[in-house]
Structures are given as structure tokens and as C-alpha cells.
A protein has these predicted regions:
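Glycine-rich N-terminal segment of FAD-binding domains in flavoprotein oxidoreductases
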Residues: 1-89, 96-104, 192
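Short, basic, glycine/proline-bearing loop/turn elements
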Residues: 1-3, 56-57, 161-165, 341
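Structural signature of FAD isoalloxazine-binding scaffolds in flavoprotein oxidoreductases
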Residues: 31-50, 102-124, 150-157
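Non-transmembrane, aqueous-exposed alpha-helical and coiled segments at domain scale
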Residues: 75, 125-127, 331-332, 351, ...
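C-terminal substrate-binding/cap subdomain adjacent to the FAD-binding core in PCMH-type
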Residues: 115-308, 313
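Substrate-recognition/cap regions that form aromatic- and gly/pro-loop-enriched pockets
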Residues: 261-384
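Activity-critical C-terminal alpha-helical subdomain
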Residues: 364-415
């Protein structure tokens, strides 16, 4: 594994490396994007904020920067990311490259906020890419799984530093369906978690607030990220272990965790402190993005499959909204989306669950999250993305020898 400390060093490493060349980040992708028997690159020595342009509302960061490490320096500069997911351990290059997202009907993925990037090609050339320079590469490269080249710097749109107030509560699932449009439109961020064998959901909203920011709670490690302590995660993992050993208790455990509403209540924090949540229970995950208008029908059908087949497990289904974008391989290309995520505890076989629900996602025209488990390959994926052929043409032009394709990506990209 090679670990460059500068863009020049990165370019030399890529130019001279034995293929396939892949970049490893924080290991938060479930798909084998980084596996290689060639050259593995780490950008851990290429981290930090390069600069903040307050007038243009943008910040440039080094590609190896972890999302959690950007929060405080950006905040100190008076800005924050416009949106994040509930995990902030990822490297920004990997999060952008796979279309990682949070929730919010007026907010896109992290990729949609990319205003420019610097890309090291297979030949070791460094390209500056933006709407005004190498525009085609910028258009296609914002979500590109590292198959066009290696990011060295990324420029993101940012907002003036802001506070968010979080509210969590339990509501009947039937009420959630009736009020879904209203809840989506009334809040900057809305999502819910549904334990499919329960009749209630755990809803969550985040809205901009001027309330005083309370001191973070929990251990010192959690304080810097504004997270709650992880006692509830330990209880939840115990429940997962019980369900693995005694599958018949899955339903009662799901109803217990729903009605216990772990994490219920309200709190206010700076945005970078409140977006992330403690995630200490390991799992495997599948996520698809379906048209937003079909989201409620799709998740209900997913839950019905789980109930009908009595598939054991304790993890909830997660439901979020993401705004459409124009990125060629984005799951949100040209359509507002609802993302639906199913999880299985790492101690259990995930295949029975994922094999059962994936056809439901296909029925609704779902596009898979690039970093999460799915079974689609190039022939099927090409039917989901109108710009597929144009992207593949761009990829072959930039990397004619397929230097950035490992075995998995050859199947996904079509060789």
C-alpha cells in the first residue's frame, strides 16, 4: 500500500503503479470497491482544509480528509457543510465518489455540492475540473467510484455556520403514511426508522434554530462529535444477539425498541455535531433510491415481504429523502428520491433478507447505493442510468487500459 503526502507524489505513484489501482478510505463501503491484487493507495496523509472562500460559499479540502475532521476547522472559518449523513467517519473522496447523502427534500448528496475537483489520471496527469474547465469530466466525475482517476482536492459548496434542533418521536405507521408529504415539506430534514414487525415508526427531524447550544454529552471521544453516549447501542446489540440465537423473538424485540424510542427527545447542536450518530453495532446494508412519489408504497411492500417470510432480525428500515441532481451515475439523477435502507446484524446471514427485498426495489425502478450491497451488474445498471454510455465513453478515454478497474468493477462497469 502506498501513502502519498502530496499531489505530485500521488501522480507519480499512480503513473508507475501496477494495476489495478484502487484507493482505500475509511472502509465504510460494503461493496468491494477497494479490493485489488495490484496497488492500493491511501490518502490518509492528504487531509485538511486547503482554503475557504466566504464570498463564494465554498471550501476546498484534501481528498483524504475524514468528514468528521472537517467539521471544526470549517466551523472555525464560519461555515459548515450543507448536509451530511448520520455517519461521518468516511473520507470525503469516498463519500463523494459513491454519492453518499443525508436526508432533506431540498438537499442533494455530497456529490451534488462538488463545485470543482482535481483529478489524477491513469497516466499521472493532474486535471482541474469544474463547470468551466474539463467540464465533461466534472459532470460525470462527481459520482464515479474512482474509475476515472484519483481525487486529490475537492471544492464543496458550504453554508454559513448554523445550528440544528433535532426531534425524535414515535408515531403510528398509519399516521406516518398520511402525513408523509406534510412532514417532508415542513422540515429541513425528515427521516424515519421502521422496525417492520412493529406498527409504529421512529420519526426524526432537524431544523435550523437560534437556540443556545448545550454542552455535548457522553464520553470525551463523543463530545467532539456532539453524539450521545452509546449505552443504547450496547442494549441494541444485545437485542441483535438474542434475535440471532432465538429468531422467534425478533418481533417482540422490534416492538420493544420502537416503543422504547431510544434516542427520543430533543437537542440542539452546531450542524457538524448533530448530523452524526453513534453507530457501534456492526451490520450489512442494502440501500436503493426510488422515485420519491413511490417511496411509501415501496417501503410498505418491503416490510410486508419481511413480515410474510418471517425474516429474523432487529434492525429497522431507514427512509430518507434526497433532492434530484444532474450527475451521470448518481442514484438521484434527474429525479427526487426516497432512499430505503435495510440492514442485517453482522452476526446473521444477510442474504435471506436482501434476496427477498431486492426485487421489490427493482419493481419501483430503484437505483442501488454504490457503496452498499446489491446484485446488479453492468447490463442491468445501464438500463437505470440514461447517461451510462456517455460515462463509459469518458471512462475509456481517460483510462483506456482500465487501470482503475478491479474484478468487481469490471463486472459493474462492463469491462
Amino acid at each position: 500500500m502506498l501513502s502519498p503526502a502530496s499531489e505530485g507524489e500521488l501522480a507519480a505513484f499512480v503513473r508507475d503503479a501496477r494495476a489495478p489501482v484502487r484507493v482505500v478510505g475509511s472502509g465504510h463501503s460494503f461493496t468491494p470497491l477497494c479490493e485489488t491484487d495490484g496497488t492500493l493507495l491511501s490518502l490518509d496523509r492528504m487531509q485538511g482544509v486547503v482554503g475557504v472562500d466566504l464570498a463564494a460559499s465554498r471550501a476546498t479540502v484534501r481528498a483524504g480528509s475524514k468528514i468528521h475532521s472537517l467539521g471544526r476547522p470549517l466551523h472555525d472559518a464560519g461555515v459548515g457543510l450543507k448536509n451530511q449523513g448520520d455517519i461521518d467517519r468516511q473520507a470525503i473522496a469516498g463519500a463523494v465518489g459513491t454519492g453518499t447523502h443525508g436526508t432533506g427534500p431540498t438537499l442533494g448528496s455530497l456529490s451534488s455540492e462538488v463545485q470543482a475537483f482535481r483529478l489524477v489520471t491513469a497516466q499521472g496527469e493532474v486535471l482541474a475540473c469544474s463547470p468551466n474547465e474539463n467540464a465533461e469530466i466534472w459532470e460525470g466525475g462527481r459520482t464515479s467510484l474512482g474509475v476515472l482517476g484519483v481525487f486529490s482536492e475537492i471544492t464543496l459548496g458550504v453554508a454559513p455556520a448554523y445550528r440544528l434542533k433535532e426531534r425524535n418521536w414515535v408515531m403510528p405507521a398509519a399516521d406516518c403514511w398520511r402525513q408523509l408529504g406534510q412532514l417532508k415539506d415542513a422540515h429541513r430534514h425528515f427521516e424515519f426508522f421502521w422496525f417492520p414487525m412493529a406498527d409504529e415508526v421512529v420519526a426524526k427531524t432537524l431544523d435550523v434554530t437560534d437556540e443556545p447550544v448545550r454542552a455535548p454529552v457522553g464520553s470525551d471521544r463523543m463530545q467532539a462529535r456532539g453524539e450521545e453516549g452509546s449505552w443504547d447501542q450496547r442494549v441494541f446489540e444485545t437485542g441483535c444477539q438474542v434475535a440471532r440465537l432465538l429468531p422467534g423473538l425478533s418481533g417482540p424485540l422490534q416492538r420493544f425498541f420502537t416503543r422504547g424510542a431510544m434516542g427520543a427527545g430533543e437537542r440542539a447542536r452546531w450542524s457538524h455535531e448533530i448530523f452524526p450518530s453513534a453507530r457501534t453495532v456492526l451490520f450489512n446494508e442494502m440501500e436503493y433510491a426510488v422515485p420519491a412519489a413511490n417511496g411509501a408504497d415501496c417501503i410498505r411492500e418491503v416490510a410486508e415481504v419481511i413480515r410474510t417470510r418471517n425474516i429474523a432480525g432487529v434492525f429497522p428500515i431507514e427512509f430518507r429523502f434526497v433532492k434530484a441532481d444532474d450527475i451521470w451515475l448518481s442514484p438521484f439523477y434527474k429525479r427526487d428520491a426516497a432512499t430505503i435502507s435495510v440492514h442485517q446484524y453482522t452476526g446473521q446471514d444477510y442474504k435471506p433478507l436482501f434476496d427477498a427485498v431486492e426485487p421489490v426495489f427493482w419493481k419501483y425502478g430503484g437505483r442501488p447505493h454504490w457503496g452498499k450491497l446489491h446484485s446488479l451488474r453492468a447490463g442491468q445498471l445501464s438500463q437505470l442510468y440514461p447517461m451510462w454510455d456517455r460515462f463509459q465513453g469518458l471512462r475509456r478515454r481517460l483510462d483506456p487500459d482500465a487501470k482503475f478497474l478491479n474484478t468487481y468493477l469490471r463486472d459493474v462497469m462492463g469491462g
